[in-house]
């Protein structure tokens, strides 16, 4: 067999071709590896960039929320200044610019999302009674105040309307002693309510001659003392100035000292609570093992004995299943724990909580009926003693008999020499 030799030139060419193929494969592999590595790096870069964007957005949201919190804290004060109106306006404008997510981040010393966000009713139903053209005779109704719109209109407004109906020849006007609340209502609802100085200045500017100040306060406590001091500074601006009694009248010497005012209040609030609960009588409620607890605010003032006197009054009336308590636990026997113990020892299994306050505002909605662990409702439930705990969120001011008691106090002041 003849073997045809392969020319040397072809052998070298074939080798070069194989070499080129190997080089090409190597280059392709390298390119693929670099591509894969570059791809992974690109995704990592994108992830990092995305994270940074999210963090920047979160920081921006918190910054906007913190700004509003600062503006709210600035108006959460008891003193009115020349800047108050502008501060109230600025706080609301800043709040309105926030997104829903940003609003949830608002948190300050006193600021929270509820300051502007909580629905407390229609502010337009409330009359701030701050107009001029007062005339010579004015009844200035002074309240601590509340930012709860419905309660302000029904409870404080209820007393004011009753007084205006009873004394058509007098002009009824309003003042709040809590500037914190005045600022809250103004900032949120653009409703302007006079503080004591503003109301008294308005009376002077309108030429009022005879001024009767009717406080809606429960007792002769710290708020009542501050009221009398403020009025004293304007005493020489009017021909006559008279301050009527608070709801419970004179304090008395000890916890056994009761009076006609306390008896009238005890009867009125108990009757209203029994009716609201659907019972024919207090005795009928007792037979079903139901007790009523009226929760007041409490105070460190010497007038705190008024709460003990109200408990004495309930007992004097034979209201064995009615108890008095206070948020502050002053006096001590009105603290929540003490009241729970009293009901437990008496064997009551059903409890109805109702505020002993002129308005059903923050204390009634949160401290009494709220869902937090420290609310009265929650503490009664946590005790494990009772089968049911119900709440009645209604202020004293909406009860007709209470309104008429204020009317009587105003008449007594008018008649006083």
Label for each model-derived stretch:
Residues 37-50:
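Bacterial lipoprotein signal-peptidase II cleavage site
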Residues 28-36:
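Hydrophobic core
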Residues 112-352, 357-417:
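Extended amphipathic ligand-handling, pore-lining, and cofactor/metal-binding catalytic surfaces
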Residues 17-26:
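Bacterial N-terminal signal peptides that target proteins for export
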Residues 57-120:
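Beta-rich interaction/scaffold domains
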Residues 9, 14, 49-50, 57:
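Serine residues within intrinsically disordered or low-complexity segments
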Residues 1-18:
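Short, Lys/Arg-enriched N-terminal segments with co-localized hydrophobic residues
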Residues 52-73, 130, 134-136, 143-145:
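Acidic/polar, low-complexity intrinsically disordered N-terminal segments immediately downstream
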């Amino acid at each position: 067999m003849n073997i045809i030799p392969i020319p040397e030139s072809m052998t070298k060419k074939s080798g070069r071709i194989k070499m080129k193929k190997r080089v090409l494969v190597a280059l392709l592999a390298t390119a693929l590896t670099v591509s894969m590595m570059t791809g992974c790096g690109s995704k990592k870069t994108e992830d990092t960039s995305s994270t940074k964007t999210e963090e920047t957005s979160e920081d921006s949201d918190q910054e906007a929320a913190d700004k509003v919190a600062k503006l709210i804290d600035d108006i959460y004060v008891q003193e009115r200044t020349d800047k108050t109106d502008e501060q109230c306006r600025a706080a609301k404008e800043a709040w309105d610019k926030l997104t829903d997510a940003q609003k949830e981040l608002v948190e300050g010393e006193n600021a929270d999302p509820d300051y502007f966000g909580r629905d407390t009713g229609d502010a337009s139903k409330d009359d701030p009674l701050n107009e001029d053209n007062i005339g010579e005779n004015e009844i200035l109704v002074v309240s601590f105040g509340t930012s709860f719109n419905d309660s302000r209109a029904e409870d404080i407004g209820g007393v004011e309307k009753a007084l205006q109906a009873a004394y058509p020849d007098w002009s009824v006007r309003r003042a709040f002693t809590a500037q914190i609340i005045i600022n809250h209502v103004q900032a949120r609802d653009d409703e302007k309510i006079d503080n004591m100085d503003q109301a008294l200045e308005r009376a002077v500017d309108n030429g009022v001659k005879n001024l009767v100040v009717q406080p809606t306060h429960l007792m002769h406590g710290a708020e009542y003392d501050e009221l009398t001091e403020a009025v004293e500074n304007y005493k020489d601006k009017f021909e006559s100035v008279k301050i009527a009694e608070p709801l419970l009248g004179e304090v008395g010497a000890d916890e056994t000292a009761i009076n006609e005012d306390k008896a009238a209040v005890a009867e009125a609030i108990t009757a209203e609570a029994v009716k609201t609960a659907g019972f024919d009588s207090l005795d009928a409620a007792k037979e079903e093992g139901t007790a009523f607890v009226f929760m007041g605010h409490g105070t460190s003032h010497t007038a705190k004995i008024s709460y003990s006197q109200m408990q004495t009054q309930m007992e004097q009336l034979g209201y064995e299943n009615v108890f008095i308590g206070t948020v502050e636990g002053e006096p001590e026997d009105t603290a929540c724990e003490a009241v729970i113990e009293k009901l437990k020892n008496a064997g009551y299994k059903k409890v109805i909580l109702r505020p002993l306050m002129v308005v059903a505002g923050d204390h009634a909605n949160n401290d009494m009926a709220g869902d937090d662990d420290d609310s009265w409702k929650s503490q009664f439930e946590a005790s494990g003693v009772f089968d049911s705990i119900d709440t009645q969120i209604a202020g004293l001011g909406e009860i007709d008999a209470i309104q008429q008691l204020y009317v009587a106090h105003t008449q007594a002041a008018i008649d006083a020499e």
